[in-house]
């Protein structure tokens, strides 16, 4: 049995239910509603105090949206630098460290190239890269890419077998889902279970 079978099945359903329609809404519909749904579903809303947007007369998450639109993929900015710059911008605006949230927000804005930072996935990656420290986004991305390259062919084969999406962004998110699932299993074994990758620990 292909070890990515469950991940492809589960992410296919999740992408259809949330990622794809919400990303479309962010880019082509009510962006405020979309960013609110992302923040709520991914449980990052608590990092963005209302006193820094509604409290100063702005719409909820308006500073987040303004910051996100400053980093567009067509500007050819390095995606890692874009995530780190957005993290700094949002920390300045909301007085919180929000690396995980920034990577998630920017993934929805770009839809590709952005590697989502998540602590459950980090736990999985650390089994191969034990010296990797939390919040080291450069190191996280480097390790993530190494592991993805090893498994990309198997993921593609399983997506083909299931007649799932064959685009690279989808394969990358299947791999994210796989890392989260392994990390969650490790957390449960240690008695420290947390939410899934889509709502992972910050």
Give the location of each predicted region:
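An N-terminal alpha-helical hairpin/helix-loop-helix interaction module that forms a charged
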Residues: 1-95, 111-202
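Short hydrophobic alpha-helical segments that form membrane-spanning helices or hydrophobic packing faces
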Residues: 101-107
């Amino acid at each position: 049995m292909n070890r990515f079978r469950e991940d492809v099945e589960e992410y296919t359903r999740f992408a259809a239910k949330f990622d794809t329609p919400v990303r479309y809404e962010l880019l082509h519909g009510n962006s405020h509603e979309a960013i609110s749904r992302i923040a709520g579903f991914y449980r990052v809303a608590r990092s963005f105090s209302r006193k820094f947007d509604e409290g100063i007369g702005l719409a909820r998450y308006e500073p987040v949206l303004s910051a996100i639109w400053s980093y567009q993929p067509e500007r050819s900015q390095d995606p890692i630098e874009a995530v780190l710059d957005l993290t700094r911008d949002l920390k300045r605006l909301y007085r919180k460290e929000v690396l995980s949230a920034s990577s998630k927000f920017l993934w929805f804005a770009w839809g590709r190239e952005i590697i989502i930072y998540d602590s459950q996935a980090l736990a999985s990656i650390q089994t191969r890269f034990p010296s990797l420290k939390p919040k080291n986004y450069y190191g996280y991305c480097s390790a993530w890419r190494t592991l993805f390259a090893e498994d990309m062919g198997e993921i593609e084969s399983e997506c083909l077998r299931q007649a799932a999406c064959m685009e690279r962004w989808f394969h990358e998110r299947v791999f994210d889902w796989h890392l989260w699932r392994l990390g969650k299993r490790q957390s449960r074994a240690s008695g420290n279970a947390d939410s899934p990758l889509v709502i992972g620990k910050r």
